[in-house]
């Protein structure tokens, strides 16, 4: 289960990593979004991006995600999806359909 504390830290951390305004939304999907998670469930997060992230930002994201895994004894599975790909494939590819259908928006750019 994604607790309020985890959610707040997740949003704060991702906003710090993506301070370049490249992030459009943070979406929770999977068993946590469906309220079907167990103690062993990972926390599936999709980050909707305006453009590809550069290698330095990706490295920061990987390190930060690993820290979150250790801090909460949970696996944070974080993927990035370019907004243009979500627009193009959102109604065709099962994975994108799943994120759109069951996803819970945790944060969205104003």
Q: What are the roles of these predicted feature ranges?
A:
Residues 1-25, 33-39, 50-110:
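Catalytic core of pol beta-like nucleotidyltransferases
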Residues 44-48:
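Short beta-strand->loop micro-motif that forms the acidic, two-metal-ion catalytic signature
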